[in-house]
Amino acid sequence: MTDNIMQTIAVIALGCPKNTVEAEYLLGIFQEKGFKISSNLDKADIVVIHTCSFIKAAKAESEKCIRTILDIKKKKSLRVYVSGCLPQLLKEKMSVLFPDIDGFAGTGTLQYLPDLVFGKNFGRFILPPGGLNDSNYRVLSSTIPSAYLKIAEGCGHVCSFCIIPALRGRYESRTMESLVDEVAALAESGIKELILIAQDTTGYGKDIYGAFVLDKLLVKLSKINGLKWIRLLYAYPSSITDGLIEVFKEHKKICSYMDIPIQHASKNVLSAMKRPLNTPGIIEKIKRKLPDIVLRTSIIAGFPGETKKDVNELINFLNRGYFQYAGVFEYSDLKEAVSSKLKRHVRAAAAKERKIMIENAQYNIFQAKIDKIKNNTIEFLVESCLKKGNVYSIKGRSSFQSPEIDGNIILENDKPLTVGGFCKAKVRSVDGYNIKVYI
């Protein structure tokens, strides 16, 4: 073994679950090359910072993290590499902003990062955008007993506020065979919940199979032994097919839950965003065919040209009660995005005020929905169990809650529960977006 192989590496993943999965693949690649893996920065000889730059806040977080690690580098022998969206966005500017970084890898070169660390290639390593695909070996992170499955890379849409196509390239689906093999390995390792992700999950397969075939993929995955739940995030409204809706009806392993980012409900704003104008109608159709499904969405407040009338139209649509959860974000103006050139930008203070209005409206809807199931029995996945005095404080999630964004199930119990197991309890009350239960 060379000195490089004996060294310890830590990978820091910033941003969304898609970056988490890529970091897991990176760790797998490094481990196969003989590196020791550690989450302890004090023990690391090499640190890889896997960055996000989708919005201003993500870009700022990435830059702050880089500076923090570079401060550590001043005090110890440490090599630092930056990968992902920030190098893809800034390219050669990275070496000017951060001259002490040892190397950079854009989104299309992640699989070659170990070569850069080994010194086979020196300096910047920026190539066309893309991402890791068809790789089965991962070092799973703290998401156990749940795991994300990235089914595609890139994006084929032209949303005016988004720079993902420039950062991630065109839409590329992974093959069904590679996904089935990976999920079988995940299930064998003890994973109970599988969460499908991509920039657009419902666009899956069109590029390689000639049609949207997410429904067929879900059927294959639902046959894998060991899995209890299969969850779908990042569904693009206009790609949701009748076949997909039927699969949700027929297969119990598929959670009756779907994340569909609509971004807005006003046609004026949707048009400026270059999003599907028939989005409200699509949501109505889904709820008509799947009345019990729990829907989550994402909304942008303060988009250029948005008026108070548009906001009222959005809130009126939300008040129909189609969504149980909504992530609301103030518009982030990136100079690289088409929307930055639009007229009538909304003042930051007004955007913040609108965000709060939308959040309050949605929370009232959430409370009303939970009130309707008080004292009903629900099943949840146990994620932690800590003893506090004579009581066990237990946290988990139901089939209608995604990790980190939809709150938790909270149970105080006199007996411990097994992490990774499932338990049934009755709904008592809400605390924020957490749901308190009792046995």
UniProtKB/Swiss-Prot annotation:
Binds 2 [4Fe-4S] clusters. One cluster is coordinated with 3 cysteines and an exchangeable S-adenosyl-L-methionine. One of its GO terms (biological process) is tRNA modification. PROSITE patterns: MTTASE_N, MTTASE_RADICAL, RADICAL_SAM. Residues 7-122 form the MTTase N-terminal domain. It catalyses: L-aspartate(89)-[ribosomal protein uS12]-hydrogen + (sulfur carrier)-SH + AH2 + 2 S-adenosyl-L-methionine = 3-methylsulfanyl-L-aspartate(89)-[ribosomal protein uS12]-hydrogen + (sulfur carrier)-H + 5'-deoxyadenosine + L-methionine + A + S-adenosyl-L-homocysteine + 2 H(+). [4Fe-4S] cluster 1 binds at C16, C52, C85. It is found in: Cytoplasm. Its EC number is 2.8.4.4. SUPFAM superfamilies: Radical SAM enzymes (SSF102114). This is Ribosomal protein uS12 methylthiotransferase RimO. It comes from Endomicrobium trichonymphae. The lineage of its organism: Bacteria, Pseudomonadati, Elusimicrobiota, Endomicrobiia, Endomicrobiales. The gene is rimO.
